[in-house]
């Protein structure tokens, strides 16, 4: 399958893109589920897959028999800064490039995720945090170019404004791409990151 390319008109007005700044893209409050701590600390011989740092609170004692694997390098860095030893990463290549389960076939793999995750996965889900929509108004209905930081943000925005499905959509090379591409197959364009997308889409405009 050939990757779709971004259909960029020259001189895209910054008022037509979302988000203009990264902070605008946060639609949810993320809250760790405290009752998960004892369950996590009791885990042994598990492969733990984490795609967001929110899935693991600071200071949880992870048994040494477990393997910790992240969805990307950024999550690795953030969890390492919290003091966790990370065994490897899928380097933002998404769930299609899941942890190398065949290398650790004696482990049961768990995907630490949030309560709104409806995605099918070869891994069992372990719900470790909740997503609560923020009360701020999301001003996106007149936007034409979108970069999505997460699949759940795209799905939530689509519920609020179904017409945005006709716009130009982009996201990173991770699980978000898999989720969004399933909904608008062949119409979402992957980028290395938000900055890469913003640079390309506004390259011909006056700063």
Spans of features found by a protein language model:
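Signature of uroporphyrinogen-III synthase
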Residues: 1-207
